Amino acid sequence: MPNAAEIVPDYLLIGHITHDVTPYGPHLGGTVSFAAHTAAAFGLKVALLTSAAPDEPLMERLPDSVMVVNIPAEHTTTFENIYTPDGRVQYMYHRARTLEVSMLPPAWRNARQVHFAPVAYEVDPAFADVFADTPLCVTPQGWMREREADGRVRQVHWSAAGQVLPRADLTVLSVEDIRHDPGLEAEFAALAPVMVMTRAEKGGTVYVNGEPRDYDAYPAEQVDPTGAGDVFATALHIVRHQLDDLWRALDVAARLAANSVTRRGFAGAPTPDEVAQALAAVGAPGKR
């Protein structure tokens, strides 16, 4: 049986899993975690390049089918959100290793789709050169933050945006990601061939070569919004590649994101049946 590092993935994720400190105990977090669950529901061969403590028990909460290369670190990237009368304060207590091109298994360079999903400025922008000819999704929130000496996370200017965004087939971010500088919406839309700015239950805006077009979200009874944006971005990237149709892919992604907020944690990731139903709703066959 071949080693996972020798298998060409359908969907390659690059970014840190995270240990999220919550009042209910530790939770597995990170965009790659929700994205892995989503891509697996599409029946794809999913691979993850990450860095975490070698004995991190939270890794067991990833789907069993996901092929993982974990670059061992002293600690897993660890976040905690503290809610105050003045709003949320985020702390990053630990950060695992920076992910570099040399860490990538050679076979994974031939992945059919790639998703850069940094949460702690951990993905080397040089990966964009490696995947210049591969359908690439970028969810850039983790490149727009840094950790201060006391662990507090602050928003910063993303200096490599001009290197990465023009190479990406799809860029997805939320209004929360740019709350510190709303002008970044226009700046990034001018760099990215296709960019989606999500606005939670209000839908969002799609920019194609800088031209905006709004879309609506599907209504849903919200229970837990965690991970819905990751479900949306991953589904949009996958279905756009399958159908070569941005607008039908957007509809599928919006349906799955609406389902996601009605359940807690990874239960919000789509099921294979939900994927099939969403594809059928836009007249597309399932890709199981």
Regions found by a protein language model. Name each.
Residues 2-7, 184-288:
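Conserved phosphate-binding/catalytic region of the ribokinase-like
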Residues 28-32, 152-159, 185-189, 215-218:
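Charged helix-capping and loop-helix junction motifs
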Residues 15-17, 231:
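Active-site metal-binding loops of divalent metal-dependent hydrolases
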Residues 113-186, 202:
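Conserved beta-alpha-beta core of the PfkB/ribokinase-like small-molecule kinase fold
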Residues 63-71, 113, 133-138, 152, ...:
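Active-site regions of enzymes building and remodeling cell-envelope glycoconjugates
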Residues 4-11, 19-24, 41-122, 127-137, ...:
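Conserved N-terminal subdomain of the carbohydrate kinase-like
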Residues 37, 79-82, 203-207:
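Short beta-strand scaffold segments in enzyme catalytic cores
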Residues 27-42:
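Short catalytic helix/loop segments, enriched in acidic residues and glycine
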